[in-house]
């Protein structure tokens, strides 16, 4: 709950939208004892006392009308918190041109096009869950594959890539390190054309072994 409390205080949060799971809502309620937030919303599957139901609110919300004066490109669109490797996490603000800047990520780094089906492995606690899955990828016209797993296993991930014919894949080096220990002969990865990595240093041995198994250079 400390992480929630810290971010609420630093950013002046007015609303929290969360997954409706007991642990998450308990942590939020603990933080609210110190830093109350006016509006709490649960997207399900559970609702708790003090939380609005996203679905019920959505069902009765009026149609959106575009404001006469839209946001300016220089207005703040979102704020990330850094990972806090030195001291507490720090806020980093991004304006409305930020998303457009990731056109280069989707088109030139992930190498995506309108026929692409892209999968990025990144938890929603990381900025990459946004810039690695949404902005540049959709600007490129690609479809984004969402794999909601409770526990990561390299075998299950490879099964998804094989079954759904993923064409582009991005994950941290640690994921590739686990993947190369699987039996690649069990999976049809012929749809996979381009793979990228980010987040930490890539061990040369992992790079070479993945290229041997797939013919793809990270």
Language-model segments: what does each one mean?
Residues 5, 68, 154-158, 186:
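Short hydrophobic/charged patches on amphipathic alpha-helices used for structural packing
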Residues 42-50, 58-81, 88, 111-117, ...:
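Conserved pre-ATP/AMP-binding loop-to-beta segment of ANL
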Residues 139, 166-170, 180-218:
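Gly/Ser/Thr-rich phosphate-binding loop
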Residues 100-117, 124-167, 182:
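Conserved AMP-binding/adenylation subdomain of ANL enzymes
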Residues 1-19, 90-93, 120, 143-150:
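Short beta-strand->loop structural element characteristic of the AMP-binding/adenylate-forming
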Residues 16, 76, 82-85, 118, ...:
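Conserved S/T- and glycine-rich ATP-binding loop of Class I adenylate-forming
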Residues 1-60:
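Structural core segment of the AMP-binding/adenylate-forming
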Residues 22-24, 174-176, 202:
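Alpha-helix capping/helix-boundary segments
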């Amino acid at each position: 709950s400390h992480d929630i409390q810290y971010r609420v205080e630093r950013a002046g949060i007015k609303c929290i939208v969360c997954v409706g799971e007991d642990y998450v809502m308990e942590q939020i309620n603990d933080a609210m004892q110190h830093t109350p937030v006016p509006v709490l919303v649960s997207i399900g599957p559970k609702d708790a006392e003090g939380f609005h139901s996203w679905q019920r609110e959505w069902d009765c919300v009026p149609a959106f009308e575009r404001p006469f004066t839209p946001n300016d490109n220089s207005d703040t669109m979102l704020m990330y918190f850094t990972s806090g490797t030195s001291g507490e996490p720090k806020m980093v603000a991004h304006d409305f041109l930020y998303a457009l800047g990731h056109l280069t990520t989707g088109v030139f780094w992930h190498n995506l096009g309108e026929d692409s089906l892209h999968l990025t492995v990144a938890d929603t606690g990381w900025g990459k869950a946004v810039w690695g899955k949404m902005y540049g990828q959709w600007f490129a016209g690609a479809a984004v594959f969402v794999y909601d797993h409770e526990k990561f296993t390299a075998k299950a991930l490879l099964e998804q890539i094989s079954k759904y014919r993923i064409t582009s894949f991005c994950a941290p080096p640690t994921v590739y390190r686990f993947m190369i220990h699987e039996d690649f002969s069990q999976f049809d990865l012929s749809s996979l054309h381009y793979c990228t990595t980010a987040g930490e240093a890539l061990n040369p041995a992992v790079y070479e072994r993945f290229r041997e198994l797939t013919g793809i250079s990270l």
